[in-house]
């Protein structure tokens, strides 16, 4: 094995240790090492598309250079190249898609029950665009993947699976892809459908014995967006029909986008053959927004609604409303309604008055002691273990979860949280919080536990 090949294996080993599973599989794993006899001392990596290439340049080149210094005690030549599908192949895919639209559209328009809304056959909300989507650490990977899919539907990542809690922007991001594609190609056959509506379409086709028409419609789409796929759980005939539609679209290089409230393998009552297919493309999570992102969301929403909202007031609202974007926007609407009712302009004092009941409920329910007891009960350990010096894994991980939740749900400083956990240093709390954030993207069990505990504590 040449020294460059050995070095790249060295890099892969370290990246696996440094990155969570999702990050490694998305950015590093797709890179291909190219060995050139004339450039034996040059690391040449081939990126599958421009998106990955740019991301590597922006985020990993410096780290690769550092690894080279460690491995060789000197810098090496390093080059990133793009190896996209041949233009003729891409053109063939586009021509085939256009031909399928022309061939199948007349028949699809006759389909009963699934194309009745002629004014908006795609069922897309035009306000859900990438420009209107506020980006932060919690959703930047999901947004980046969505843009790549929008620019190269059926070629980039297929399917795209987006998961996360309620009200975090999954539907917005999914429909932004559809609106982007529709803007570039007004003739594209796109359908956004909530999983419950898809179930209803299956039932209707069964009642009217019209499965041929049902299949003709769903199998002829260029872009299928299925929201909240967890509602397919236990519905065997629906899963069977979706399985056939999924296969037909993927084989025809048509794009499938799916959302769920949890990781694919965590969806109970879903056939294994569907779960495995959901993993064929890119699976990305959307997490609850961090403070800065929540402030940005409020300010952007206020601007769109022509509401005068200063940063101090936005910061106050964002500081206390942490769960999801929907509740954040709900709090803003409450402040706006209170402003109109009282005849006073929106200010920090008015926001405090408008939200006092909501804040009182939150403050009453969530204390550090409550968090410790809830987490201890959940993991079946003693509350005393939360502030003990024990280092066994069965206690360390729940303790880290409790610290992370305390940072999210209380107004205590890091030193105060550390003090409540047996006089630990603030850096221990910070490490615990970062560790749990990292594990939530790579360990479905930890993510499930964290979400369940947050739900319990918020009531």
Swiss-Prot record:
Any GO BP: DNA replication initiation
Region (Domain III, AAA+ region): 123-339
Residue numbers spanned by region Disordered: 87-122
Location relative to the cell: Cytoplasm
Region annotated Domain I, interacts with DnaA modulators, chain positions: 1-74
Region of interest (Domain IV, binds dsDNA), residue spans: 340-459
Comp. bias intervals (Polar residues): 89-98, 112-122
Main location per the UniProt record: cytoplasm
Region (Domain II): 74-122
GO annotations of cellular component type: cytoplasm; plasma membrane
Residues binding ATP: 167, 169-171
Key words, A-Z: ATP-binding, Cytoplasm, DNA replication, DNA-binding, Lipid-binding, Nucleotide-binding
Biased composition (Basic and acidic residues): 99-108
Entry GO MF terms: ATP binding; ATP hydrolysis activity; DNA replication origin binding; lipid binding
Pfam family, any one: DnaA_N
Record's function text: Plays an essential role in the initiation and regulation of chromosomal replication. ATP-DnaA binds to the origin of replication (oriC) to initiate formation of the DNA replication initiation complex once per cell cycle. Binds the DnaA box (a 9 base pair repeat at the origin) and separates the double-stranded (ds)DNA. Forms a right-handed helical filament on oriC DNA; dsDNA binds to the exterior of the filament while single-stranded (ss)DNA is stabiized in the filament's interior.
Protein family according to the UniProt entry: Belongs to the DnaA family.
Subunit structure: Oligomerizes as a right-handed, spiral filament on DNA at oriC.
Free-text note on domains in this protein's UniProt record: Domain I is involved in oligomerization and binding regulators, domain II is flexibile and of varying length in different bacteria, domain III forms the AAA+ region, while domain IV binds dsDNA.
Name of this chain's protein: Chromosomal replication initiator protein DnaA
Organism: Nitrosomonas europaea (strain ATCC 19718 / CIP 103999 / KCTC 2705 / NBRC 14298)
Lineage of origin: Bacteria, Pseudomonadati, Pseudomonadota, Betaproteobacteria, Nitrosomonadales
GN (gene name): dnaA
């Amino acid at each position: 094995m040449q020294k460059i090949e050995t070095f790249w294996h060295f890099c892969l080993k370290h990246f696996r240790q440094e990155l969570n599973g999702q990050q490694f599989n998305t950015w590093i794993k797709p890179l291909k090492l190219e060995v050139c006899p004339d450039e034996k001392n040059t690391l040449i990596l081939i990126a599958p598309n421009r998106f990955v290439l740019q991301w590597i340049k922006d985020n990993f080149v410096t780290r690769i250079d550092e690894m080279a210094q460690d491995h060789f005690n000197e810098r090496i030549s390093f080059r990133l190249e793009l190896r996209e599908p041949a233009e003729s192949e891409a053109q063939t895919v586009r021509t085939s898609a256009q031909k399928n639209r022309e061939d199948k559209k007349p028949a699809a328009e006759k389909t009963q029950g699934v194309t009745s809304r002629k004014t908006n056959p795609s069922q897309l909300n035009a306000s859900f665009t990438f420009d209107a989507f506020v980006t932060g650490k919690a959703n930047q990977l999901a947004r980046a993947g969505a843009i790549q899919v929008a620019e190269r539907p059926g070629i980039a990542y297929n399917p795209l699976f987006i998961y996360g809690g309620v009200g975090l922007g999954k539907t917005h991001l999914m429909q932004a892809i559809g609106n982007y594609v529709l803007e570039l190609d007004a003739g594209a056959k796109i359908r956004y459908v909530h999983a419950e509506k898809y179930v209803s379409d299956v039932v209707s086709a069964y009642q009217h014995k019209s499965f041929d028409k049902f299949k003709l419609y769903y199998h002829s789409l260029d872009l299928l967006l299925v929201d909240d796929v967890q509602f397919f759980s236990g519905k065997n005939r629906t899963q069977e029909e979706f399985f056939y539609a999924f296969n037909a679209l993927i084989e025809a290089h048509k794009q499938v986008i799916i959302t769920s409230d949890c990781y694919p393998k965590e969806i109970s009552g879903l056939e294994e053959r569907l779960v495995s297919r959901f993993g064929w493309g890119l699976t990305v999570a959307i997490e609850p927004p961090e403070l800065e992102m929540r402030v940005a969301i409020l300010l952007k929403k206020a601007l769109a609604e022509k509401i005068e909202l200063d940063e101090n007031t936005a910061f106050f609202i964002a500081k206390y409303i942490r769960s999801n974007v929907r509740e954040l926007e709900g709090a803003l609407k409450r402040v706006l309604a209170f402003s109109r009712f009282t005849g006073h302009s929106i200010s920090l004092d008015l926001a405090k008055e408008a939200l006092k009941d909501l804040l009182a409920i939150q403050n009453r329910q969530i204390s550090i002691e409550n968090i410790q007891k809830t987490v201890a009960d959940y993991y079946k350990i003693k509350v005393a273990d939360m502030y003990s010096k024990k280092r066994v894994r069965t206690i360390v991980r729940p303790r880290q979860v409790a610290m992370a939740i305390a940072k999210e749900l209380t107004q205590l400083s890091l030193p105060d949280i550390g003090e409540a956990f047996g006089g630990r240093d603030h850096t221990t709390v910070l490490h615990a919080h970062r560790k749990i954030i990292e594990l939530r993207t790579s360990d479905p069990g930890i993510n499930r536990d964290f979400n369940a505990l947050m739900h319990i504590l918020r009531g």
